[in-house]
């Protein structure tokens, strides 16, 4: 799942506060418009208690957000066009829901003009509770909408994007983890708009390799699954049902299930990982022939989520990009604001162009 960012100016659904705040201490503040009377307005403000933070959550006063993480408001002609289309089509995008800092770059198409967006399938409620993510959770979320695959395809076919990323919450309540629903959506899209490039950013399907195969053979162009963090921090960062080896097995099986399948993964930095641990994780991904890697800064959604241990500098991100490509990744997107689906269309096209150039040079 992609990391979601929290914007305090956005009104969050009641279920979010119920999930994240009811376990904390309550402070009652009485706000009166006039002198105390029967018409006095009372507002209950709920704040996190230090007792409920846990050993890995809360904010570290010694770690200050640097200037390089500040972004200008998104703008541009293509951005406005896509935004208007989204509104009329009523599509649920991770770009907007997660307040992604790269929304302007992706929707405008960056330097290559390839507009990219990320659509969330299977609802907005996850069956897991990873400590970095602000998506609401439930053991029994609402059943998937059976019309969603076709409706999504119809909407996307009429929308001016060249590259679409399909992702979803984890659905451990479904027998196949939602793989069949994903597959139906991809097939419907390709039928209506064959030229569109489709990337699927998936869950681990509980390690069900048959579910992985179902999706791999649906017609998608890129299979993405995130290991999220280094091996040592897995149990701290991710839900216990996720796992480092399980994620690697999913990526490995996707690569081996179909010749030429492009695979992709992502790692968040700033969670306390060491350079050697990150090198180990990158080596493990290359050992199973993962093609594309994205590296970005972890940003804490709320004080109840994992503490940011470090803000990695842009220079260090540049080093990791160079290092990653030196050990064999076909493309590495590395930067403080990079996220899993960051300008995904550009990454895919650059990878393909680089591959074609190499093949041409190799021919006699």
From Swiss-Prot:
Q: Can you state which reaction this protein catalyses?
A: [[Fe-S] cluster scaffold protein carrying a second [4Fe-4S](2+) cluster] + N(6)-octanoyl-L-lysyl-[protein] + 2 oxidized [2Fe-2S]-[ferredoxin] + 2 S-adenosyl-L-methionine + 4 H(+) = [[Fe-S] cluster scaffold protein] + N(6)-[(R)-dihydrolipoyl]-L-lysyl-[protein] + 4 Fe(3+) + 2 hydrogen sulfide + 2 5'-deoxyadenosine + 2 L-methionine + 2 reduced [2Fe-2S]-[ferredoxin]
Which CDD domains did the record assign? Radical_SAM
Please give the Pfam families that the UniProt record associates with this protein.
LIAS_N, Radical_SAM
Q: Which cofactor does it need?
A: [4Fe-4S] cluster
Binding residues for [4Fe-4S] cluster 2: 126, 130, 133
Entry-linked SUPFAM superfamilies: Radical SAM enzymes
**Sequence ranges of Low complexity compositional bias:** 32-52
* Enzyme class label: transferase
Quote the pathway field.
Answer: Protein modification; protein lipoylation via endogenous pathway; protein N(6)-(lipoyl)lysine from octanoyl-[acyl-carrier-protein]: step 2/2
Alphabetized UniProt keyword annotations: 4Fe-4S, Chloroplast, Iron, Iron-sulfur, Metal-binding, Plastid, S-adenosyl-L-methionine, Transferase, Transit peptide
Instruction: Enumerate the residues binding [4Fe-4S] cluster 1.
Output: 95, 100, 106, 341
Give the transit peptide, as a residue range.
1-70
* Listed EC numbers: 2.8.1.8
Q: Write out the GO cellular component annotations.
A: chloroplast; mitochondrion
Q: How is the cofactor bound?
A: Binds 2 [4Fe-4S] clusters per subunit. One cluster is coordinated with 3 cysteines and an exchangeable S-adenosyl-L-methionine.
What GO annotations for molecular function exist for this entry?
A: 4 iron, 4 sulfur cluster binding; lipoate synthase activity; metal ion binding
Q: Could you mention a single GO BP entry for this protein?
A: lipoate biosynthetic process
- NCBIfam families, alphabetically? lipA, PRK05481.1, PRK12928.1
Q: Which HAMAP family match?
A: Lipoyl_synth, Lipoyl_synth_plantC
Protein name (record): Lipoyl synthase, chloroplastic
User: What gene name is listed for this protein?
Assistant: LIP1P
């Amino acid at each position: 799942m992609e990391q979601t960012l929290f914007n305090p100016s956005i009104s969050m659904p009641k279920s979010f506060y119920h999930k994240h705040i009811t376990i904390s201490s309550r402070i009652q503040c009485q706000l009166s418009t006039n002198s105390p009377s029967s018409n006095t307005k009372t507002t209950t403000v709920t704040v996190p208690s230090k007792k409920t933070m846990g050993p890995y959550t809360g904010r570290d006063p010694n770690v200050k957000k640097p200037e390089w993480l500040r972004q200008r408001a998104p703008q541009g002609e293509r951005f406005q066009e896509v935004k208007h289309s989204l509104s009329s089509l009523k599509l649920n995008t991770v770009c907007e829901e997660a307040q992604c800092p790269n929304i302007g770059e992706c929707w405008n198409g960056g330097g290559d003009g390839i507009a990219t967006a990320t659509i969330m399938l299977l609802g907005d409620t996850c069956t897991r509770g990873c400590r970095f993510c602000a998506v609401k959770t439930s053991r029994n979320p609402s059943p998937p909408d059976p019309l969603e695959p076709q409706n999504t395809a119809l909407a996307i076919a009429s929308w001016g994007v060249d590259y679409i990323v399909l992702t979803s919450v984890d659905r451990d309540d479904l027998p196949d983890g939602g793989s069949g629903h994903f597959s139906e959506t991809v097939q419907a899209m390709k039928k209506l708009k064959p030229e569109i490039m489709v990337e699927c950013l998936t869950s681990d399907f509980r390690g069900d390799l048959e579910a992985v195969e179902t999706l791999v053979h649906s017609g998608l162009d890129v299979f993405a699954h995130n290991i999220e963090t280094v091996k040592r921090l897995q149990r701290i960062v991710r839900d216990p049902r996720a796992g480092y080896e399980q994620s690697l097995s999913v990526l490995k099986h996707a690569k081996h299930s179909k010749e030429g399948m492009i695979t992709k993964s992502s790692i968040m930095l700033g969670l306390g990982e060491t350079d050697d641990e990150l090198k180990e994780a990158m080596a493990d991904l290359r050992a199973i022939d993962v093609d594309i890697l994205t590296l970005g800064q972890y940003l804490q959604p709320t004080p109840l989520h994992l503490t940011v241990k470090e803000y990695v500098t842009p220079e260090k991100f540049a080093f990791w990009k160079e290092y990653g490509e030196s050990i064999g990744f076909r493309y590495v997107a590395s930067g403080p604001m990079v996220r899993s689906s960051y300008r995904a269309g550009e990454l895919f096209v650059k990878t393909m162009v680089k591959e074609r150039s190499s093949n041409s040079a190799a021919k006699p």
